[in-house]
């Protein structure tokens, strides 16, 4: 009988019964150590639900947040061990890992929970938005295009509506359009755009498999994203938001793409329950993925150097509405007018932490 299916008083005991004689031997039986794969929302507001996904997480009974804040009540966990959830308490002021205890032992998340140390742009005063050549019908997003957090009770202040309301009101983004919308940081003259400021939190020698871009996304259930379009992320301002399959998508380019509605070879309507965190390791940006495939080990210093040596070091995220093929799925563009909201662009450590069944073997691993 699996440990989690047995009654608590019957677990971890071997009983030998013969005639009127009985011998019990106590020891611990459990599955492999639990692992963590993702967190639904790594920058939650107090009162928001947080779900941690992984394996072996059944019967999670204790959660410890950064700052040694313990939660022992109100925890829900999946009977198959694929997740546990809790409500974010007030008073969590530091970032780091979440530690949990359950039927199969301890688990820990990467140290990116509640971690805003390396914020790029949050649209509320941390980081500086840049914009130029703005027009009513143009792709450039300025400060007036920002909107108030649309999620009830979240109170995040301002956020980015990726397709500005002025473009939706005009009929949406036409099919076949690259550079449909774009949002940038201020660039060369802004100290926040020199990412060497982040070395105090993420050492320059950190491999890019252990450093990630995170941002939060909200797409309402009654208006899912599924028919077309994708997000392009530019490490600096030297690309055209031409999208997947274009010259921007070269193997030596510092770009990445996000297409959440393509899952396991199929198109699945994408929406979120409140704000959801997206984590993209820098090892998945084209240039660095190519280096890793060639058995090299790019580091965070390479990212900073590439940005600081660029003519324009603005960091940018934009929407592209062209035809493309991604993970063997071909998407044909249509008119697009879905509301997609982004917030809290940031750089975070993403090294996995594995807690062994044997304390002397405990280690962190990629």
PLM regions and their residue ranges:
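Ser/Thr/Pro-rich low-complexity tracts
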Residues: 1-136, 148-151, 157-166
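Extracellular Ig-like/FN3 beta-sandwich strand-entry sites
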Residues: 7-11, 93-95, 208-210, 275, ...
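Extracellular polysaccharide-targeting segments
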Residues: 112-121, 322-366
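Extracellular beta-strand ligand-recognition surfaces/modules
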Residues: 214-215, 232-236, 277-339, 345
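Extracellular ligand-binding interfaces
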Residues: 216-292
């Amino acid at each position: 009988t699996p440990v989690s299916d047995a009654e608590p008083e019957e677990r971890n005991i071997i009983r030998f019964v013969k005639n009127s004689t009985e011998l019990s031997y106590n020891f611990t039986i459990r599955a492999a150590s639990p692992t963590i794969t993702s967190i639904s929302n790594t920058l939650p507001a107090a009162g928001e639900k947080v779900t941690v996904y992984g394996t072996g997480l059944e019967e999670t009974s204790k959660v410890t947040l950064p700052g040694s804040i313990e939660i022992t009540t109100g925890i829900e966990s999946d009977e198959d061990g694929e997740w546990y959830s809790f409500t974010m308490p007030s008073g969590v002021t530091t970032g780091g890992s979440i530690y949990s205890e359950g039927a199969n032992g301890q688990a820990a998340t990467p140290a990116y929970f509640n971690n805003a140390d390396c914020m790029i742009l949050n649209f509320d005063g941390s980081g500086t938005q840049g914009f130029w050549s703005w027009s009513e019908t143009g792709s450039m997003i300025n400060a007036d295009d920002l909107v108030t957090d649309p999620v009830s009770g979240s109170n995040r202040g301002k956020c980015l509506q990726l397709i500005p309301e002025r473009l939706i009101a005009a009929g949406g983004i036409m099919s076949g359009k690259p550079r449909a919308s774009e949002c940038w940081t201020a660039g060369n003259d802004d100290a926040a755009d020199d990412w060497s400021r982040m070395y105090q939190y993420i050492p320059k020698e950190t491999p890019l498999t252990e450093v990630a871009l995170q941002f939060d996304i909200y797409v309402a259930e009654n208006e899912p994203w599924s028919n077309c379009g994708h997000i392009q992320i530019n490490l600096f301002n030297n690309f055209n938001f031409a999208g997947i399959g274009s010259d921007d998508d070269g193997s030596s380019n510092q770009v990445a793409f996000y297409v959440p509605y393509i899952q396991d070879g199929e198109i699945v309507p994408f929406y979120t329950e409140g704000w959801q965190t997206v984590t993209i390791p820098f090892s998945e940006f084209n240039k660095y993925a190519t280096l890793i495939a060639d058995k090299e080990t790019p580091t965070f210093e390479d990212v900073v150097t590439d940005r600081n040596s660029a003519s324009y070091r603005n960091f940018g995220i934009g929407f592209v509405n062209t035809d493309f093929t991604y993970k063997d799925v071909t998407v044909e563009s249509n008119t697009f007018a879905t509301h997609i909201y982004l917030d809290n662009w940031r750089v975070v450590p993403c090294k996995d932490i594995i807690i062994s069944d044997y304390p002397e073997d405990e280690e962190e691993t990629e």
